[in-house]
């Protein structure tokens, strides 16, 4: 039997995932602050602002801008808000979400200033026990999922039964979720790969080819794995869908906002100029400095994140970034 599911945030990924949930037979309520988006989904089953490629969203999707109305009957609440605004947005829902509801994060990022993962931010904001929090991450480019191309993802929750409930609620003929209890690993994968995607995109935009991209991706994977394991993650997670899988998708597609943002930097645009031409948030941009700070906190070197931080804050070029990344000393891989 279908569930009542609320999605907080009607951006491209939130809307595409809402469609997955509706296709799986659930009753889906989208919550958004923008009245134009609310009216578009509610009255016309169309999100012309964030997901115009889908001409008609399912009939069992609706929308509201009222927080209490959005979540009052929810069995599952999905959070698809820009990571750096999650805490501010979620405190407005504290006390409104039913006690039995599972809260699921689609967000990927490390909070600036606190260096906290999204599971920590969500649980603190809503005063939520660990067994009622789940995260979803994987090679999930929103436009391809909106077009119903076959895809898989990973659902993580410390309570495997609740992870399974969430997975069952988003299983369709084209969308296959797997389950794990490694919340930390899933969160770290989703956050840190965005920094790698920025760097790969920058290299591509600057005209470098496959060798350079592969070099950055593999060193990025090593960096995010070391950081994740230091934070308490299972190393196996980094070699599955949420790790290598997401890295491949994000670092190799113009559909990735992080890759595209990096490519624009590589072509010579400033951070401000690249931001202006982006449709939506490239989460890797605010996450980069937080990753460097987290590495310092955990005593784990983060050379790629550090060099990308220099790109974003000092405006160094792609060639300078790559030179700084590898240095001149011979080291073990």
From Swiss-Prot:
Cited InterPro entries: 6-PGluconate_DH-like_C_sf (IPR008927), 6PGD_dom2 (IPR013328), G3P_DH_NAD-dep (IPR006168), G3P_DH_NAD-dep_C (IPR006109), G3P_DH_NAD-dep_N (IPR011128), NAD(P)-bd_dom_sf (IPR036291)
PANTHER family the UniProt entry points to: GLYCEROL-3-PHOSPHATE DEHYDROGENASE, GLYCEROL-3-PHOSPHATE DEHYDROGENASE [NAD(+)] 2, CHLOROPLASTIC
KW Calcium (keyword) present: no
HAMAP family for this protein: NAD_Glyc3P_dehydrog
A GO biological process held by the record: glycerol-3-phosphate biosynthetic process
Family as reported in the entry's similarity comment: Belongs to the NAD-dependent glycerol-3-phosphate dehydrogenase family.
Pfam families: NAD_Gly3P_dh_C, NAD_Gly3P_dh_N
GO CC annotation terms, alphabetical: cytosol
Keyword Amino-acid biosynthesis: no
Residues given in the record as sn-glycerol 3-phosphate binding sites: 108, 138, 193, 246, 256-258
Protein name: Glycerol-3-phosphate dehydrogenase [NAD(P)+]
Domain of life: Bacteria
GO MF annotation: an example: NAD binding
Residue ranges of coiled coil: none
Catalytic activity line of the entry: sn-glycerol 3-phosphate + NAD(+) = dihydroxyacetone phosphate + NADH + H(+); sn-glycerol 3-phosphate + NADP(+) = dihydroxyacetone phosphate + NADPH + H(+)
Subcellular location: Cytoplasm
EC number: 1.1.1.94
Entry binding sites for NADPH: 13, 33, 108, 142, 257, 281, 283
Keywords assigned by UniProt, alphabetized: Cytoplasm, Lipid biosynthesis, Lipid metabolism, NAD, NADP, Nucleotide-binding, Oxidoreductase, Phospholipid biosynthesis, Phospholipid metabolism
Active site: residue positions: 193 (proton acceptor)
Function of the protein: Catalyzes the reduction of the glycolytic intermediate dihydroxyacetone phosphate (DHAP) to sn-glycerol 3-phosphate (G3P), the key precursor for phospholipid synthesis.
Pathway terms, separated by semicolons: Membrane lipid metabolism; glycerophospholipid metabolism
């Amino acid at each position: 039997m279908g569930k009542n599911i609320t999605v907080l945030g009607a951006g491209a990924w939130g809307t595409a995932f809402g469609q997955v949930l509706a296709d799986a037979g659930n009753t889906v309520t989208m919550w958004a602050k923008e009245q134009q988006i609310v009216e578009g989904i509610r009255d016309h089953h169309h999100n012309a602002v964030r997901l115009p490629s889908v001409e008609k969203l399912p009939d069992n999707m609706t929308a509201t801008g009222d927080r209490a109305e959005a979540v009052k009957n929810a069995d599952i609440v999905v959070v698809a808000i820009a990571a750096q605004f999650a805490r501010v947005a979620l405190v407005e829902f504290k006390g409104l979400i039913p006690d039995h509801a599972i809260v699921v994060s689609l967000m990927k990022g490390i909070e600036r200033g606190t260096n906290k993962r999204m599971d920590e931010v969500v649980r603190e904001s809503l005063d939520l026990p660990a067994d009622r929090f789940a995260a979803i991450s994987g090679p999930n480019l929103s436009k391809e999922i909106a077009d119903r191309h076959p895809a898989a993802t990973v659902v993580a929750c410390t309570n495997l039964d609740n992870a399974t409930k969430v997975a069952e609620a988003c299983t369709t003929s084209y969308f296959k979720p797997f389950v794990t209890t490694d919340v930390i690993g899933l969160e770290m994968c989703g956050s840190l790969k965005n920094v790698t995607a920025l760097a790969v995109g920058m290299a591509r935009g600057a005209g470098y080819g496959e060798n350079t991209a592969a070099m950055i991706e593999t060193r990025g994977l090593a960096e995010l794995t070391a950081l994740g394991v230091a934070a308490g993650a299972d190393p196996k997670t980094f070699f599955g869908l949420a790790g290598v899988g997401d890295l491949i998708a994000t670092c190799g597609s113009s559909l990735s906002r992080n890759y595209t943002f990096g490519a624009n930097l590589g072509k010579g645009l400033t951070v401000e100029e690249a931001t202006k031409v982006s449709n939506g948030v490239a989460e890797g941009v605010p996450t980069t400095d937080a990753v460097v700070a987290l590495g310092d906190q955990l005593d784990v070197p983060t050379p790629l994140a550090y060099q990308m931080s220099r790109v974003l804050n000092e405006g160094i070029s792609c060639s300078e970034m790559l030179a700084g990344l590898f240095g001149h000393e011979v080291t073990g891989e």
